[in-house]
Amino acid sequence: GAIYGNYNIGVIITEGKMTQQWHGEIEGCYWASDSQLYQLTRPVIGVDREGKAGAYWVGVPQQGTFYYYDRPQTNVVGQAKYPAVTATTPADAIDWNPYFAISCGPMVLYDGKAAADNSMVDDKHYYTNYECWDESGVYSAHPDRSAVGITEDGKIVLFICDGRIDESQGAYIKELGPIMKSIGCVHAMNLDGGGSTGM
C-alpha cells in the first residue's frame, strides 16, 4: 500500500484476507510540524471473488476492524479534527468483500469526477488533501506517477507516467485524474510514484 516513515499506512487484501493493516490515525504532517493525529480513510481499489472491481475508502478505527465507504473522511490538515471512523461515519459503511485489493492514494478520480485538485485552504494546505498526504511530495511535485483505475465496464487499468526524460516531465496530482478519465476510467487512485514507477 503506502508507507509513512517505517510503517504501513494502508491495507492489502490477498485472497480475501487482510495481509497488511494500519490503525487509522496519522500525524497531520510527515515532518512533525503538525503533530495532531487525524482519523483517516484511505482509498482502496480491488476486485471481489467474481472479479468485479470496486473503488472505496477504507477506515480502520482499531486493529482488526475496518469499514469501506463511498466517500472519504474529509480531514484538512491544520483545520478542525473529525471524529473517529465508525460503521456510520463518514458515511454508512458499504458491504464489500474484496478478494484482492490495495490502498494508496490519493483517489484522483471518483464516479468520473476529479477527486484531487490544487485549491488551498491557506498558504500551505490543500483543500482536497482529505487523506493527509505529504503535500510537498504528493501534491506540489510532478514526478513519475503510477496509478490504477477502473473503467465503466469494470476493467482494471494500470498507468505509468515517466518523469525523468525530456519527452515526459511527470504529472501533478491534479493532472492525474483527468489523464485517467481520458483513457476511459471512472475511478482512479494514485500509487507510489518516483522510483517505484520503474518496477
Residue ranges and their predicted role:
Residues G1-M199:
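Gly/Ser/Thr/Pro-rich low-complexity, intrinsically disordered segments
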